[in-house]
Amino acid sequence: MNRIRIHVLPTNRGRITPVPRSQEPLSCSFTHRPCSQPRLEGQEFCIKHILEDKNAPFKQCSYISTKNGKRCPSAAPKPEKKDGVSFCAEHARRNALALHAQMKKTNPGPVGETLLCQLSSYAKTELGSQTPESSRSEASRILDEDSWSDGEQEPITVDQTWRGDPDSEADSIDRDQEDPLKHAGVYTAEEVALIMREKLIRLQSLDIDQVKRLQHLLKEKKRRYLHNRKVEHEALGSSLLTGPEGLLARERENLKRLKCLRRYRQRYGVKALLHRQLKERRMLATDGAAQQAHTTRSSQRCLAFVDDVRCSNQSLPMTRHCLTHICQDTNRVLFKCCQGSEEVPCNKPVPVSLSEDPCCPLHFQLPPQMYKPEQVLSVPDDLEAGPMDLYLSAAELQPTESLPLEFSDDLDVVGDSMQCPPSPLLFDPSLTLEDHPVKEIAEGPVDILGQMQMAGDGCRSQGPRNSEKAPAPLSQSGIATANGKPEPTSVS
């Protein structure tokens, strides 16, 4: 049997063809030190070290410096002639620029003689020597030259027209009084600083006006929004918050849809807190520290309803009720309801204080009185009924310069039955007293406290006896009263 052998050749199906990499140019083969410059095409050295290869079609540049007389060490291509001059790339460029400048200098402008030759055709000959034919031929020649000169001119294009500012003030008559160096374009450092300062001030004023305009527009739009919102709330009523009781199926569906629209794009949880903090920071950055106490919740109102009408008072911070309806909040901590009395209950909110049972001002119980006033001493009736003529006034008790302060010994303070002892001040030592005991009493030291104590004991024990015996030794001397007049004492 003949066997058939089938050789399957490998295919490139499913294999990624390798991308041919571009060969990097080889570096220069300079032996004295490593050079990273690429080689010239077909050579082993770069353009800087190509002179190391003697067989390379390069030679040293032919430029010789006029300052130091040295020759340029750069390489230049060999010329076709053996003794030809060849320059490197840099000196060849400089040589071309010099030739171009020299050609401009050698090409002068139009000279006066050439201009006169061009205008000689317009010169008029003498009238006597001219014939009609010559004059006619001269006129036709002038017309031909004019038509030829007109035909030589090319039509003017848009690019060839004058490009100037139509509102330019260069030719204005009103600007003659300005600075002639305004359009010079050259300024000193002080002038540049002054001009830039004026421009910045003008720009700042324009920016401030623009910001004020934007603030006005923002306030106007906010006012319109609040007005439309109020009109909408008055038209819809409080049915959005009280519930769908008493509504038709279609109205309930519309109410549900409206609530969904109101909750759309509303932030909750952490996002709401972060958004509020962002607003507060923006307000502090724009309005300053004066607006720090004003928060975004200042426009929120109380959620309580009185007779199906929502309360218009502002809610307390961090709450949803005002001060009047704070008791409706089940999560309150800083307020309690007043207990009132058993007969008349009271539900007014009262802030929690140090007391355990806070009360409103109407039901507040006063604490017991800590201070007790002293008891007034009872005055006997016989003292109250005493004659008032026996008391001296304050004016009578004041001493004068001419008369000394003296008291009467018969002055009855308590009553007729009790008289005070005589005062030692009543004795005048200047008087000539014939009675030696009285004189000794007036001149000698007197124990006032001892006499008053003895007189008091005598008044308690003897009663009216002392009142009869005490003034006896003083009967012979004159006694001055409170009025300063001496009166004789009488013994009853």
UniProtKB/Swiss-Prot annotation:
Sequence segments annotated as region (Required for interaction with other NSL complex members): 308-364
Modified sites of kind Phosphothreonine: 131
Disulfide bond residue pairs: none
GO biological process, one term: chromatin organization
Phosphoprotein is among the record's keywords: yes
Tissue expr: Ubiquitously expressed.
Keyword line: Chromatin regulator, Isopeptide bond, Mitochondrion, Nucleus, Phosphoprotein, Ubl conjugation
A GO cellular component entry from the record: NSL complex
Role noted for this protein: Non-catalytic component of the NSL histone acetyltransferase complex, a multiprotein complex that mediates histone H4 acetylation at 'Lys-5'- and 'Lys-8' (H4K5ac and H4K8ac) at transcription start sites and promotes transcription initiation. Required for NSL complex stability and for transcription of intraciliary transport genes in both ciliated and non-ciliated cells by regulating histone H4 acetylation at 'Lys-5'- and 'Lys-12' (H4K5ac and H4K12ac). This is necessary for cilium assembly in ciliated cells and for organization of the microtubule cytoskeleton in non-ciliated cells.
Subunit structure: Component of the NSL complex at least composed of KAT8/MOF, KANSL1, KANSL2, KANSL3, MCRS1, PHF20, OGT1/OGT, WDR5 and HCFC1.
Name of the protein: KAT8 regulatory NSL complex subunit 2
Naturally occurring in which organism (per UniProt): Capra hircus
Originating gene: KANSL2
